[in-house]
Amino acid sequence: MPAYIHIEALSLDCDYSDYGANTHNFIDAWVAVDEQTIGCFELPSTFPVLKKGKHKVSIRPGIAVNGIGAARSYYPFCKPADYLNLELVEDSIITLNPVINYFPIGAGFNMAWKEDFESAIGLSPTFESDTSIMRVNDAQAWHSENSFYSGRIVLPPDSLDFTVATSEELTFHTELTGDGSAMLEMDYNTNDTMFVGLMYYKNYKTEKLPLVKVLPTDKEHGIPQKWKKIYINLGHIMKEENDASYFKVYFTSDLTTDYDVDAGYVYHPVNEQRYYYLDNLKVIYRPR
């Protein structure tokens, strides 16, 4: 007869000055007992463990890569929550409240770029953009103990599109050998559809590659009302284009593309201002 473990949710604990905000979207628990993986469990979950007595139980956070529910993975930038001598009792439920931490900086975690909009803005409009991005602290901005401002882009109904990109050139891609990985963490609140992608400079020209279509969050009277978080995989493109001079992350409302990013619908509000709020942006990587 098995023992049972119940996990309602995972929490993230991190130092704001080093890692930024502790927002997360951990939807799964990847569970190992005595270093052997027993499964990935969508939270909340109560699951059986065919062990009794004291055992090491490790919980790793799981995400939906690129916001795709079918693309589940554990998050490689976070340490597992370890219970070294957890007492497992047959036909009994033990409830765990795992607290997750990032790996130490320089030891499994590297911050290539971070933007929380609390000071100068590290995003710049491209030449084809019809507007820019501003830091605001209105009612829709992300507010917490350490956060008072968010980035906001507004397009009036008669405007065309915006594109903003990281002002900083990202050059860590040469370190991404083997199974090295890179990810963009992004909090957003929008009433419109937008693309997130990578632009890179190669062979004397700039290429743009959209990666993920981000759909609108909840809205009321045309104003976006709900913040969401997404994890966007950058590493595979950076490794494929390893001979590029540099990369930049970009955000755009221009949904015309030659790439089949998503077969789903494209939404634009009709006769409404289009709002795009961004916050807690992090480009993180771990080389191999």
Can you name each region flagged by the protein language model?
Residues 207-244, 258:
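Extracellular carbohydrate recognition and processing domains
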Residues 97-133, 276-282, 287-288:
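Extracellular carbohydrate-recognition regions
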Residues 33, 51-70:
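A short, solvent-exposed beta-strand micro-motif common in secreted/extracellular proteins
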Residues 66-99:
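Structured interaction patches on ligand/partner-binding surfaces of diverse proteins
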